[in-house]
Amino acid sequence: MPCWLDGRLHTDGRKKMIDLYTWTTPNGRKVSIALEELGLAYTAHAIDITQGEQHKPDFLTVSPNAKIPAIVDHDNQYSMMESGAILLYLSEKTGQLMPTDKSRYWQAMQWLMWQMAGPGPMLGQVHHFTKFNPDKSPYAQARYLKEGQRLYGVLDRHLQDRQFIVDDYSMVDIAVWPWISRFEWQTINMNDYPNIVRWYTTIAERPAVQSGYQVPKPTGSIPIPAT
């Protein structure tokens, strides 16, 4: 798959079209994985949120909310923030990775919104209270972990008789998968969710996922649940 990293060609010579501003977070990885899956040429710019780089004036012109990821598409001079909006934009731009049948499209949309409203914010709070602020707020830590486990249960039941979240592999899987990849941070016992493990490991084997996971910098192997 083509990938541009900080202006250096990674695999092929196609014209650079998209600037991606990102970091090694689940939301950032959604977009880098999508770009790899779609085969779009891009330049990845590291925005180190641990050093406050998301608050720099230059980045705020692209992402007024001071959040990664954000893109600039030089094909049409669009700039865009919010990972969900970017995924839908890239799907519409390429005609790929979202169902074309109206009924299936709206099934995909409901699960995409589920990710934005559920696993994204709730598991983000699990990360904060369990990994970065452990044992300092027991009520919050327990509350968000319980909600995270509930959301895992919702997804596991849904995947019981499905290979992917909505029929074929889609932007919905790309949106949800990076949040599950932090199961270790979340102290989730993956043995409780066998359908998620099957789905997760299948996606982890995709070359585009393996490439996109390492953007904007290598961070080691994708975590795989013990079996």
What are the residue ranges of the model-derived segments?
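GST-like domain detector, emphasizing the conserved glutathione-binding G-site
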Residues: 4-6, 12-142, 146, 156
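Enrichment for repetitive, rod-forming helical segments
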Residues: 11, 36-37, 189, 213
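Terminal-tail/helix-coil boundary detector
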Residues: 209-227
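GST-like fold's C-terminal all-alpha helical module
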Residues: 90, 115-207, 212-214
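Short, solvent-exposed turn/loop segments enriched in Gly/Ser/Thr/Pro and often Arg
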Residues: 48, 171, 216-219
